[in-house]
């Protein structure tokens, strides 16, 4: 990996520019769509080139490598590029755009959330301010006026972000934007972003999400269609959009500590993201329809999973998300621990009054029982443990108005603390045990998983007269029918 980072460093220009397609002249080859899509010179077609998108992924890689190894060479390369972009886009550089600030939001969002990660890694507020500025100017300084992939809504540039109320356009672009907005809201305290985020989230779960957590049902734009247009066989549901759905909802949870966001993220993770990769880890789905047969080459011209794609964002996106999941298992404040995803884990959480060792044993999502062992540093400590009670234990599988169980029976969950039944009422989707904990204390949460039949709202034409089978957080597939 170090040799690859050295190569990246050698490819970077002295001023910080780092987009090899222009540096090497590959962008001049207009026989390929990618060449035309890059523009004829750096930053000349921001609306559709992937210069800032690629740099955002590079920042995330640099931060991840630094976190894993402590080596900062790649991080320094990323910082040099970020300062270059700030100079060119918001100050002006004689070598680019005639010396005028480009002052345009990228056509494919990603750099916004990546800049926030760069801020977390370095503490430099320049990167947080850049993220906010890219969000603030979207739909303000530039709006395309074409159709399809050049329409204003395709890259969420039809309105300033604070005026947007519905999920539109390319689903991956959209979820990356919403993730960046949630990051900026949380880190800057800019609550003017909250109404738009709340409205967009509600619009997604009420009208535009498949029961698998898949987003972006429409081919062509790879994105959101009209409300309730959720076909099964023709669904697009790009794997990257499901990754974006997980990221957006996790960030909304971190901002609001409401379990409904994790409930959506969990459904998307188990039923769409993981469906996008084979058990062997080397074959992939780009698209994830809910219905197919052995004859339909639905997966970018392939009938089943493919070892690779010409545009290989989905395999690399799975490799990007899966290593992040352990870091999403728990969240904490000074005196609170939130258990978000359930899986066998062992961790140490640094609360204000001392560290807490926490282990979790479970066969979830197939097994119904989750067991915790809690051991505060020093032998005892007072804090609150918040355990998620998933939406699927109630009268519907996933938050939103779209889907409900055929039958109103609830799965009665049970909480035991050191073998004694705990009495608590969930608040914002969490049941809370607040007490002075001692080393070796045990908590057991039982989440019954009966097989359930689900129905969609009648507005979803493709699902009329149909039922979907779920158990726990999993959607089940009928094969060879």
For each feature predicted by the language model, list its residue ranges.
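Glycan-recognition and catalytic cores of secretory/periplasmic carbohydrate-active enzymes
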Residues: 1-481
